[in-house]
Structure formats: C-alpha cells, structure tokens
C-alpha cells in the first residue's frame, strides 16, 4: 500500500521557511492520526509531497479516509510501486496494469521522472504510449482530452503507477493558524462554520450555551466530536459548556420583548469573549449569515460585536441557506442538524431588526450581570477526546455486549451512506437499520418487549444514543461492540 500526498498549492507560494514549517506540520498531523488508528504504517516527508506506506493493505480504506479528510491536502495519489530494470521493463509493467483500462478507449501517457536515467520523461511517455498503442488494438492515442490518462512516475529505481487520484480537503494544515472558539449550537450553520475554520488550519474549540437541558447538550457534543474526529483529530481541543438558562430567565424577566434577541446575542458574545481570553484564543466563530434572522441585520450585528474586544469571524456571512445545507450534507453534519432543537428564536415575539444603542443599554441596565459572571465561572470544560469516555461514565448502566443474546435485535444506527458502504449482516440475527438521527422519534414505535443492541463503527455514537434513550425512560437498550 502506498499513497502520495500532495499538499495544497497555496503552501508552495509561501517563503521557503514557511513552506517547510507547514509541510512539517502536515506530516506530523498525518502521522498522529494514522498512528492512533492503524499499525505498521509509515509516513515520510519528501519535500514536495508526503508518502504514506505499509507492507500490508489491511488499513488501505482507513488510511485513505484519513488522508482525504485531513486539512492541507490538495489530492492523494494511490499508487502501485515496483522496481524496474530498463525502459522496456517499465512498458511491460504498465501494459499489465493498464490494458483493461484502455481497451476500446482513447488514452495518453503522462510521465514524471526523478533521478539519473538514460531516458527523459518525454522519451518515457513516447515509448510506453507507443507500446500500449501497438499492444492494445482497440485503444487509440489521443493527446488532448483522452478517455484515460495513464500516469507513470519514476524515482530512482522505483516505478510508481497511479491507480487512482482522490480529492483532498484543501486549505492549510491544522495548527498553522491561530486557535478559534466556535459558538456551536448543533444546527446547520455553526457546524459548517466550524468546519470551514478547521479546513483553513485553525484548531477549533467549541463553546456551547445550553438553553435546552441534557438532551440538547448530548446532541451538540455528538456533532462537535464528529467534526473533531472526522477533520481535526490531530489537535487537542476543548469543549466548553455554559448553562445559560439563568441568563435567559433574567432576560425574560427584565428585558423588553423587542430587544431580547439582540441582548441574548450580546450576552453570548460577552461570555464567549471572557472564555476566549481565559484560554488565550484569538477569535470567536459564529454561523451567522446576513439577514437570516432578525438579530443578523448589519445594525444588530454591529451592536452585538461592540460588547467584546475579541475578534468575531462569520465565515457564512454572505451564504445562502441552501448552500449551507448542501455543505452540511457533504461534510456529514446535516443528519445531526435535522433533529437538533433550536431555542434561541423563541424568546422574542416581535424582535427588532434595527436596534438602537441607547435602548439596548437601558434594557441591559436592568440586567444583573453577576448572573452572567457566575455562569461563565461555572462553565464546564473538557478535552473533546473525553466525550466518549464521559458517555461511559455518565451512563454506567449502559451495558456493552460482544455477542448477540437470544431474541435480541441489533439496531444499526449508522447513517444510510455508512450502512450502504459496509452493511451489517449477522447470521441468524434480526438486524434493523434506524439512523441515529431518527432514533428519538422511531424507537418508541418498536416492540418494547425486546432488547435492542445499538451498533456503530466506533461505539461512540451508540453509547451517546443509549444514554439519550435511557434519559427518555427506555431501559431495554445496550451497546453492541463485536
């Protein structure tokens, strides 16, 4: 197994020292993730690319998944590496691999060469291309826009034949930019805005203002852990939860109805600014888009920004909602957002779209700011890697089983795409598929006389969902970890 990783082109327009630093960070990020999930996989920095190799193909799919979801990578080449004797030997090896690919098609050979050889790259292309054209009668050479491009790389005495090219995330390696604090609600917008900053190279910490109790917090932890695990697991980041119900209660009691929405957002920013300062985080990230709701007019956003000196970043400010949802679907957060409760929009019946500074300040003068200081002081912070451990500790009564007991039903709670890619089939066992985001509404319709074993690939989602179901009063659930 061998992959050639090409860093994002923006890295190579940097100065030599910055380029070296960025590629070194990318190398370390890849190595850290690969070592945490696989064995016997080596990572090498080759200046203009990074090689990931193993003697075995056991972790092929796992490594490819890691590389295509790691920030800073433009594309990944999947290659077959072998030794060669001479130019004709190269041709014979390429013919063996490429014959079925070019039959009844047009093709071109593109070659790259490093090291000392008795042939040039152009001579290599002509020799191999001419040989393929003669050996495969139904194939035809076409230099521009062919059906198939046969890619060959020669480095020293090694021949690399490109089997496939996979698109990377792009952006910058994680950790090359300064840290940010994402105000995450679990909805479409905050998940996408967090992803965009991960992709751009920032370590994204998560701050959740809890307005909806334990069930809401569990859901937000799930999407935060998913984003970290899928795109940023090379970094150590924090998840911070702030119980904002006392603040909301004070606003509902003291503040004029029309000003509630903007003042709540101002309280969010004040609290987040204090947390960012405590942890030396340079900027806040929100999922706000211009005009999407009443608090997101330019006037209101300016009043919201003015309560903190911390930089506020809004990567979605000019995005349409449809585009946000499409990207959420692409990165895998759509299913979380679909069932995430939304609380912020319900506290003001007639919200202002053009707040006045003096009126906001007059309403806030009624507010007891010691409540805000108290909830920030009592905020709970944890290493995001401990979310899975917390789910175990928070629900020790959730039993894990390795074998399916008699009459039990296995519930595959993975997303439809994951289930399609690797269906769960167990001989003699009733396996049902209910995606995790539908469990809350569909589990109660199942036969409650039976025991249900929740299954996901890593066991994190199944434990969190089991905790959620038990909070709803269902005690017939266990976690299936074969």
UniProtKB/Swiss-Prot annotation:
Q: Where in this chain does the record put each THUMP domain?
A: 61-165
Q: Which UniProt keywords apply?
A: ATP-binding, Cytoplasm, Disulfide bond, Nucleotide-binding, Redox-active center, RNA-binding, Thiamine biosynthesis, Transferase, tRNA-binding
Say which family it is in.
Answer: Belongs to the ThiI family.
> What NCBIfam families is this protein classified in?
ThiI_C_thiazole, tRNA uracil 4-sulfurtransferase ThiI
- Could you tell me the EC number(s) of this protein? 2.8.1.4
Q: What is this protein called?
A: tRNA sulfurtransferase
Domain spans labelled Rhodanese: 404-482
Reaction(s) catalysed by this chain, per the record, are: [ThiI sulfur-carrier protein]-S-sulfanyl-L-cysteine + a uridine in tRNA + 2 reduced [2Fe-2S]-[ferredoxin] + ATP + H(+) = [ThiI sulfur-carrier protein]-L-cysteine + a 4-thiouridine in tRNA + 2 oxidized [2Fe-2S]-[ferredoxin] + AMP + diphosphate; [ThiS sulfur-carrier protein]-C-terminal Gly-Gly-AMP + S-sulfanyl-L-cysteinyl-[cysteine desulfurase] + AH2 = [ThiS sulfur-carrier protein]-C-terminal-Gly-aminoethanethioate + L-cysteinyl-[cysteine desulfurase] + A + AMP + 2 H(+)
What class does this enzyme belong to in the EC scheme?
Answer: transferase
Function recorded in the entry: Catalyzes the ATP-dependent transfer of a sulfur to tRNA to produce 4-thiouridine in position 8 of tRNAs, which functions as a near-UV photosensor. Also catalyzes the transfer of sulfur to the sulfur carrier protein ThiS, forming ThiS-thiocarboxylate. This is a step in the synthesis of thiazole, in the thiamine biosynthesis pathway. The sulfur is donated as persulfide by IscS.
Q: Does the keyword ATP-binding apply?
A: yes
What GO CC terms are in its UniProt record?
A: cytosol
Pathway in which the depicted protein is active: Cofactor biosynthesis; thiamine diphosphate biosynthesis
InterPro entries according to UniProt? Rhodanese-like_dom (IPR001763), Rhodanese-like_dom_sf (IPR036873), Rossmann-like_a/b/a_fold (IPR014729), ThiI_AANH (IPR020536), ThiI_fer (IPR054173), ThiI_N (IPR049961), THII_Thiazole_biosynth_dom (IPR026340), THUMP_dom (IPR004114)
- HAMAP family given for it? ThiI
Q: List the disulfide bonds.
A: 344-456
Q: Where in the cell is it found?
A: Cytoplasm
Catalytic residue positions: 456
The residues that the entry says bind ATP are: 183-184, 265, 287, 296
Q: What is the lineage of its organism?
A: Bacteria, Pseudomonadati, Pseudomonadota, Gammaproteobacteria, Vibrionales
Give any single GO term for biological process.
tRNA 4-thiouridine biosynthesis
What gene codes for this chain? Answer: thiI
Q: From which domain of life does this come?
A: Bacteria
MF (Gene Ontology): ATP binding; CCA tRNA nucleotidyltransferase activity; tRNA binding; tRNA-uracil-4 sulfurtransferase activity
């Amino acid at each position: 197994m061998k992959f050639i990783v090409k860093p994002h082109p923006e890295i190579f327009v940097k100065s030599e020292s910055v380029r070296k630093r960025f590629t070194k960070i990318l190398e370390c990020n890849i190595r850290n993730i690969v070592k945490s999930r696989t064995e016997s996989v080596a990572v090498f920095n080759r200046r203009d690319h990074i090689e990931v190799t193993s003697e075995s193909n056991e972790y092929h799919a796992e490594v490819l998944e890691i590389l295509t979801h790691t920030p800073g990578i433009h594309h990944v080449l999947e290659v077959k590496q072998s030794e060669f004797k001479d130019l004709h030997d190269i041709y014979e090896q390429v013919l063996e691999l490429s014959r079925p690919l070019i039959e009844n098609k047009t093709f071109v050979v593109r070659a790259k060469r490093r090291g000392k050889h008795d042939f040039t790259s152009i001579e290599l292309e002509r020799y191999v291309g001419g040989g393929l054209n003669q050996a495969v009668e139904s194939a035809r050479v076409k230099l521009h826009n062919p059906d198939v491009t046969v890619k060959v790389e020669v480095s020293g005495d090694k021949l690399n034949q490109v089997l496939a090219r996979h698109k990377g995330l792009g952006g910058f390696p994680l950790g090359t930019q300064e840290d940010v604090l994402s105000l995450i609600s679990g909805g479409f917008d905050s998940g996408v805005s967090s992803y965009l900053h991960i992709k751009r190279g920032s370590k994204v910490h998560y701050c959740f203002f809890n307005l909806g109790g334990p069930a809401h917090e569990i859901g937000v932890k799930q999407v935060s852990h998913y984003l970290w695990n899928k795109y940023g697991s090379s970094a150590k980041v924090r998840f911070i939860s702030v119980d904002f119900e006392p603040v909301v209660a004070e606003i509902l009691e003291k503040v004029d109805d029309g000003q509630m929405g903007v003042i709540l957002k101002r309280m969010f920013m004040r609290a987040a600014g204090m947390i960012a300062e405590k942890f030396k985080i340079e900027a806040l990230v929100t999922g706000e888009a211009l005009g999407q709701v009443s608090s997101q007019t330019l006037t209101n956003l300016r009043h919201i920004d003015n309560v903190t000196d911390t930089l506020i970043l809004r990567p979605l400010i000019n995005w349409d909602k449809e585009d946000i949802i499409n990207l959420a679907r692409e990165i895998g957060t759509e299913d979380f957002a679909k069932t995430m409760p939304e609380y912020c929009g319900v506290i003001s019946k007639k919200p202002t779209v053009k707040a006045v500074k003096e009126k906001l300040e007059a309403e806030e003068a009624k507010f007891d700011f010691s409540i805000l200081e108290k909830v920030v002081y009592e905020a709970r912070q944890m290493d995001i890697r401990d979310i899975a451990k917390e789910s175990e500790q928070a629900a020790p009564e959730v039993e894990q089983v390795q074998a399916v007991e008699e009459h039990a039903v296995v519930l595959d709670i993975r997303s439809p795409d994951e289930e399609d890619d690797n269906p769960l089939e167990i001989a003699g066992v009733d396996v049902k598929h209910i995606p995790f985001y539908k469990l809350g509404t569909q589990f109660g319709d199942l036969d409650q006389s039976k025991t249900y074993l929740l299954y996901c690939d890593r066991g994190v989602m199944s434990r969190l969902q089991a905790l959620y179901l038990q909070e709803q009063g269902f005690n017939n659930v266990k976690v299936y970890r074969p």
